[in-house]
Amino acid sequence: KAGFTRSGPDMWHINCRPDHLIASAKKSLQKLGLERIPLWQLHRIDSRVPRAEQFGAVKQLLDEGLIAHAGLSEVSVADIKAASAVFPVATVQNSYNLADRHSDDVVDYCAASGIGFIPYYPLGGDGELTRAGGALDKLAKAKGVTQGQVALAWLLKRSPTMLPIPGTSKVAHLEENVAAAGLALTDEEFAALDRKRR
């Protein structure tokens, strides 16, 4: 990812000036020891920099072979369309989970356009949905799995281009998350969870 500068602990600022984006990509290549970054995300669109300049910098990185694929983060459908007019958008990363559905239209657009959708905070949820005895809890217990596994299975059923990458710090959690890919929700189970949030 690129598009931020850091001025201190927990002090991040959007910076999508073309020179900064290109320098950030080159620095990442050096740190990673790569000749090309497989997937590079524009972390935010900078309201202070003309979009044509930001998107042009991404295209330059692609044209020069420094990145293989480019994505966007925290964008609308209109943003994706504008960027797609300049470079091929491979992925979009927005906040999205069972409880946070503000990007439903973006998920649908990405699916229709063959763009990968990476949900930020995929295991997020609110008290009503995740409380003991709630819909998610009941379904997880009925299937003998965790609430997190059901939440991931719901995301995977939600869209064919959904690419959840839940953060984890323990091998047991990693194995649990991977196992969610084999958990199939019925249409009725999916719809029941879907209705709880709409």
Q: What does each model-found stretch correspond to?
A:
Residues 16-32, 76-82:
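Short, acidic/polar
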Residues 45-198:
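Beta/alpha (TIM)-barrel catalytic core signal, keyed to glycine-rich beta->alpha loops juxtaposed to Asp/Glu
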Residues 2-4, 36, 168:
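Short, small-residue-rich loop/turn micro-motifs
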Residues 2, 6-22:
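Active-site mouth loops of central-metabolism enzymes
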Residues 2-4, 41-44, 121:
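Short, histidine-centered active-site or binding-site loop motifs used for metal coordination
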Residues 29-50:
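Active-site groove signature of glycoside hydrolases
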